[in-house]
Amino acid sequence: MSRGGSCPHLLWDVRKRSLGLEDPSRLRSRYLGRREFIQRLKLEATLNVHDGCVNTICWNDTGEYILSGSDDTKLVISNPYSRKVLTTIRSGHRANIFSAKFLPCTNDKQIVSCSGDGVIFYTNVEQDAETNRQCQFTCHYGTTYEIMTVPNDPYTFLSCGEDGTVRWFDTRIKTSCTKEDCKDDILINCRRAATSVAICPPIPYYLAVGCSDSSVRIYDRRMLGTRATGNYAGRGTTGMVARFIPSHLNNKSCRVTSLCYSEDGQEILVSYSSDYIYLFDPKDDTARELKTPSAEERREELRQPPVKRLRLRGDWSDTGPRARPESERERDGEQSPNVSLMQRMSDMLSRWFEEASEVAQSNRGRGRSRPRGGTSQSDISTLPTVPSSPDLEVSETAMEVDTPAEQFLQPSTSSTMSAQAHSTSSPTESPHSTPLLSSPDSEQRQSVEASGHHTHHQSDNNNEKLSPKPGTGEPVLSLHYSTEGTTTSTIKLNFTDERSSIASSSRGIGSHCKSEGQEESLVPQSSMQPPEGDSETKAPEESSEDVTKYQEGVSAENPVENHTNITQSDKFTAKPLDSNSGERNDLNLDSSCGVPEESASPEKAKEPETSDHTSTESATNENNTNPEPQFQTEATGPSAHEETSTRDSALQDTDDSDDDPVLIPGARYRAGPGDRRSAVARIQEFFRRRKERKEMEELDTLNIRRPLVKMVYKGHRNSRTMIKEANFWGANFVMSGSDCGHIFIWDRHTAEHLMLLEADNHVVNCLQPHPFDPILASSGIDYDIKIWSPLEESRIFNRKLADEVITRNELMLEETRNTITVPASFMLRMLASLNHIRADRLEGDRSEGSGQENENEDEE
């Protein structure tokens, strides 16, 4: 029977089932494949069971109950038919819950869940809360994005996270693990943030992993093992049977927000942040014959002029059914004073980046010819200045913001605390810090040339020597641009002592924050947090993405990744000097995210801040070329000797070492002296990147399938959150949430848009079809779960409205690719700095005028 059949035919199908003439499963596949069901969907019920954004929903095996997790850190089991809550569980999580699943064959009594702080909880509904709190796994270093259970296996589950690892846990072996730097359960080390996983339903030993380098990798789990089982391979290519990347994303780092196998396991659906949804056949291998872009072509594409916009954290005005593109708002005269202010600040930021970029390019040639360690005074004077005197320091990287997410900026291991320490862009910088999570947007990274970067570092050091150093510790504002977490790009404030800032910058040590900053969904709590809170470590997404740049083989470039598709062309620091207090307000915007370093305040705990909204802005598109880092020893005195000896000993290790480098936050090295800690972090990052680069080179020699895209689904907008799901519905339909607050449903075989449902006031993140019936559950930024059923009397699809929404989404998708989300405190500091600059200018004009008057009097 054709998919376009009518209801009378369906009634006959039901009659045949009652007579035993047809298999019930065939009937289900037939009615789920009918357009009349899809186009008659109507909101049946709303479950108000949470006090925060609902980031994960999951039906149980029988379709009777829904398990949900939220920013309120609670797990709730509810009955969607009676609208009642069965169980509310205080999970023990201290950050937004991103994924929660029932373990199969446990009668819905056992649950595994993960959150933005990387902690995984194993919960038994029948046990008390205190016992359940003991069953936690703190093995992941950064955000844990997803939990995946194995069909018909009640004992094991998998997880993936910002640290680039996929871990396999067996509850028969242990129900908790708080071991420091645990690597016992690592199944795969992707060297890049692993943001989504999926298991093939009919063949559960096939595992698909979505990474922040735009790739989807498929592994055969029979060829893999962990250290706990004694057969850990330690190579990211072991067991890999296929690797998929859309051709136009080959040289980019675009995060995968969702992976889903079809019921028959023949196709995989992949949703990319700040891009579209792709369908591919994992058994296909036709992409192998296509010519891959050369390194020069990749670099050329990275040289896009950065265009930056600013968005305040908690500003969801560009989401929801009533959101409009900027061009449409201007045409209708809807520009608000707030928008006007943000636009002026954005223009100023763009101007700074352009000036810094020009200076970086002019210095690039001189930097290559200048001998190591030689930086002339004239070079320092050529640094761009903001209206008055603030220096803008740029690590020659093109920063391209795709989808900004509010990500918490983490202090880089050493440069985090110093506005001058721009070493965060150094290629050998240490890993990332643990992320806090709420909702991040996709960001792209900066690509930095080693030579230019080196020159810039030297000018930074000279600048420090020339700058005044007060006798007492002065507060220095350090801003870090981070891309880890669930929202794209975020800027976080951190106050540090100027002495430590200078010391760290003089060492020339920096770390890439691989953490993708997280953005707080609706009610950002951290936007005005005290400075101490900002010093918390968060796992960055960027560092993992930076590593991917290595595969391009450009040894001279140092990539900086940003969750928001930001081609950050520079990491800049605006250091306006307050003439009255001598305080320097350092605005350190590091697109590669610094690894949190021990700051003057001892409060850098691993405990993450929880953001009000969990919708994570996809930290996706990153255009980076990761050059092989080259060590630069800029330290002096005993610390330099200690650092050098540590590095030399580490260099003796080979790539085949059992110590598999993982993306680790710099805070893990707090135990040792600052110099040694930073050196260890940098060395470990160096080996991690080198190992990833070698594995990428091996892919060309291995028999790994490379599928082509079978179908592309467009019209939705996926840029503000990192947890946006795409899913199959039956055998004939594909669906996805969107930043416009709608649910999109397409024909799986033709990509025709068939249905549009308004399902959230801001963003729809989660879509889970009922396992048997034509019922759909959805959730997003709103604090509820919505249940949809085919209750309309006639088809209600409005094609004209759908076309309007699609057109707006395309325009706004381009706009959000160039946007950075910043906290309100950043704007206040920026305005204060400009105020100081103006005051200094006026004071200078007055003194100059009085000086001329005195000269005239003397002449008379």
Swiss-Prot record:
A Pfam family annotated for this UniProt entry: WD40
Region (Disordered), start-end ranges: 288-340, 355-676
Record-level GO BP terms: positive regulation of transcription by RNA polymerase II; protein ubiquitination
Compositionally biased region (Basic and acidic residues): 288-303, 312-334, 457-467, 535-549, 601-615
Gene Ontology annotations for the cellular component aspect, listed alphabetically: Cul4-RING E3 ubiquitin ligase complex; cytoplasm; nucleus
Protein name: DDB1- and CUL4-associated factor 6
Gene3D superfamilies recorded: YVTN repeat-like/Quinoprotein amine dehydrogenase
Superkingdom of this protein's organism: Eukaryota
Compositionally biased tracts (Polar residues): 379-388, 409-421, 480-493, 561-571, 627-636
Keywords for the protein's UniProt record, in alphabetical order: Nucleus, Phosphoprotein, Repeat, Ubl conjugation pathway, WD repeat
Keyword Repeat attributed: yes
Residues carrying Phosphothreonine: 654
Subunit structure of this chain's protein: Interacts with the nuclear receptors NR3C1 and AR in the presence of ligand. Interacts with DDB1, CUL4A and CUL4B.
Record InterPro entries: DCAF8, WD40/YVTN_repeat-like_dom_sf, WD40_repeat_dom_sf, WD40_rpt
Biological or metabolic pathway of the protein: Protein modification; protein ubiquitination
Cell compartment(s), UniProt: Nucleus
Main location: nucleus
Low complexity composition bias: residue spans: 422-441, 501-511, 616-626
Residues the record lists as Phosphoserine modifications: 336, 649, 657, 847, 850
Stored SMART domains: WD40
IQ domain: residues covered: 676-705
Keyword Transmembrane in annotation: no
